Amino acid sequence: MSDTGTKRRIERFDPAIEPKWREFWEREGIFKAGRRAGAPRRYILEMFPYPSGDLHIGHLKNYVIGDALTRYYVIRGYDVLHPFGWDAFGLPAENAAIKYGRHPREWTYGNIAESKKSLEIAGIMYDWSREVTTCDPDYYRWNQWLFLLLYRKGLAYRAKATVNWDPVDQTVLANEQVDAEGRSWRSGAKVEKRELEQWFFRITAYAERLLNDLDKLDKWPENVKTMQRNWIGRSEGAEVTFLALPPGADLHAPPPPDAEPLVVFTTRPDTLWGATFMVLAPEHPLVSKLTAPERRAEVEAYIARARMESEIERTSATREKTGVFLGSYAINPVNDERIPIWIADYVLMGYGAGAIMAVPAHDERDFAFARQFGLPVRVVVQPPGETLDGATMTEAWPGDGVMVNSGPINGLPVGKGEGQSVKATIAWLEANGKGKGTVTYRLRDWLISRQRYWGTPIPMLHLPDGTIKPVPEDQLPVVLPEVQDYLPKGKSPLAAAESWVNTIDPETGQPARRDTDTMDTFVDSSWYFLRFCDARNDREIFSREAAHRWMPVDQYIGGVEHAILHLLYARFITKVLYDEGLVPDDEPFRALFTQGMVQRRVRTPLEVVAPGMVRFPEELRRKLELPADAQSLDQARALLKERGYTLEEESNGGFTAVSGPVTMSKSAGNGIPVGPFVRQYGSDVARIVVLFAAPPENSMEWTDEGVAGAQRFLNRIVALFSPDREEIVAALNSGNGAAPEGEERALYRKLHETIRKVTLDTEQFRFNTAIAALMELLNEASRYRSEAGRVTPVFAQTAATFARLLSPFAPHLAEELHSWCGGTGSVYDTGWPEWDEAALALDEVEIVLQVNGKLRGRIMAPANADEQQLREWALTNPRVLSFVGDKTVRKVVVVPGKLVNVVV
């Protein structure tokens, strides 16, 4: 498109230009993947959202970053895949639908339409032909296919387990969905423990690969990789089997036939000789069998209390230790000693096998427990230069030293190396058949069952004889039925859909019941990036050819809050599919960028009740615990200051309470809807504010001043180039290729400095400094145009190049400027400008003059001046001569282009 026919003096940026360019991009398929077949490819992806309805400006940052990168690579000639979709199943959609009294499907698709409209008006360009929605049967069919693949490989299984139960959402949660305080990631409710039959994905089978392959991800933030390493939690040690004696067993006799093996994992097997009691997690499956009858009531009461506590509470180092003796004993395999078995809440089923050998002399938690209940403390490590006595110790000694009271390893130094205690103990255990060296992980298998309606049905059948078998692949998808009552009840609402639940096994003709749980919504997002490669394939999850064309994702963009959940699951599923030969790489995301948040201050008007007196509104009062009665301005100011707020006087005489910067959200009341803002100010203004305010990995504050600054920048572009559009076109068409001279040389150099700066900064996500460089170029071009008094070829070249450099950041105005310069078609088909190294060479450089290494002056010299010229200029410089005086010059050191040092 070109708009050079008439000369109009447009002095300000007009947002009304934007719709025509969005329509043009869509019509011409400028951002459609495959448009440049054979070109180098780029796959850029932002994490897809829950469809929450009309987007606010805070949502845009993630998408603007991805869009800027996409536009940069499109104009550079790449074939770019930049798709979009909707993470539409799961608790967020279902809970919102319940809250507003609408069916989840109606609520979800209505919000998708609103959200899509917001993205389109914001000028975020996606290849919408590849759009996916996870609640569509043609998407979740492949969730079910994936489940069956994992089931065939032994990676999906059903087991009874102690699970995390959300009492508000009435469903099970994976460990990763419970925060450090033991609360649900969605509802915030205190999580309870329940015993339930559930479906799991065996992610632990990939623990070692998930851990080791983090080292390959050199374009991921270190903090994200550290979080994953800590969550996987690799520990080296030994598995040792104790024998648990039944209650009432003779402690002096050989173990009876019904003695139970009790497997313990320890990272310090060398301290086995110091174990004086055992502790089981309250949830351990042997607790009931090992409990003496007279202790059963006390034990069961303790277990009930432990189930109400979070893991963080149970493992707190400062909390007083609690526990109950079961009334039974275990045999320590290294010395045949009978030691008492307790339960205590500081031991978790999630660590090792839910059982520990307690060595109170050398573990602080065990020491506190032993002192609390009067249990013996036996020293097996003596620190250098000290002699510890278990009876008088005031704290555990977990450090280095020499082994004592430890049979075959007495005298060895503590450590894991050759000839040290840990390695020697493992060798002794293995040689004597009492244990083995092993590795364990904190990571637990992924619990995917959910007792909620709005999710992917699990494609399994339950037969009358108790057999559980998969639905045949040709019967997929198992479609989620329409139900009217989908409120959470503690079991899946699907269980009440009798006509759906009761079915026939297609292979045997027997009656069967469908599984009524649905899948965790994180299954949906664990592979969606692969579906984008081949989104309309109705024969397979995606073709190998499409996956090999596009995968892995070159740049993934999203919040750091997904470091453990989504990103870990996506890596796991990708490795499974890699092992099946379906994808070309076993890591899904080559590079990861985690953006900061958009923040805005919350402004709350106060009620003026009398001159100098105000009253806080009720909502603010409740939120900040403020008094209800009227306050003087000084009192109000002091109360607000204590809570991180300020009091501002408005121009109309009113007063407003202003918070500090708060993440923009609907709940905080500080969101700015995308649609109204873009219609008033323009998408390009919003984009410049978001990209210029701060480095994109940092949080940024959205302010009126930032909006005004972005407007000024775009207005200045229009004011500088629009009035000269005809002259610019004529100058560009003149074919004058002469090298710039004089004043033109300075603008030409600045132009190429800017090309280099914007190129390098854009590729490094330094969008704010790239835009700052464009502002500097605009200043230089404006000064040059004013002094030249006319349009010259170098000014015209600057205008045309400016359009291309601006295109990732303010794309609508970039297209408009491109058309003013006589461009036809899209600016994105013109190619990215290359900088000229010769143009960057300076005509003159500053030379530092020194005498005996001390600064004595500066001169400007031609950049190509040789050593002899620089030497002569230095030795005749009046300031240098004044410091040399009548002394003899012994040596002159010349560093061309930098300095001359006269040594006397």
From Swiss-Prot:
GO biological process: leucyl-tRNA aminoacylation
Keywords: Aminoacyl-tRNA synthetase, ATP-binding, Cytoplasm, Ligase, Nucleotide-binding, Protein biosynthesis
Cellular component, GO annotation: cytosol
GO molecular function ontology, one term from the record: ATP binding
Pfam families given in the database record: Anticodon_1, tRNA-synt_1, tRNA-synt_1_2, tRNA-synt_1g
Motif window: 'KMSKS' region: 663-667
Enzyme class: ligase
UniProt-listed InterPro entries: aa-tRNA-synth_I_CS, aa-tRNA-synth_Ia, Leu-tRNA-ligase, Leu_tRNA-synth_edit, M/V/L/I-tRNA-synth_anticd-bd, Methionyl/Leucyl_tRNA_Synth, Rossmann-like_a/b/a_fold, tRNAsynth_Ia_anticodon-bd
Position of sequence motif 'HIGH' region: 49-59
Compartment(s) of residence: Cytoplasm
Record field: catalytic activity: tRNA(Leu) + L-leucine + ATP = L-leucyl-tRNA(Leu) + AMP + diphosphate
Coiled-coil annotated spans: none
Enzyme Commission number(s) from the entry: 6.1.1.4
Binding site for ATP: K666
Signal peptide stretch: none
Similarity comment text for this entry: Belongs to the class-I aminoacyl-tRNA synthetase family.
Name the record gives this protein: Leucine--tRNA ligase
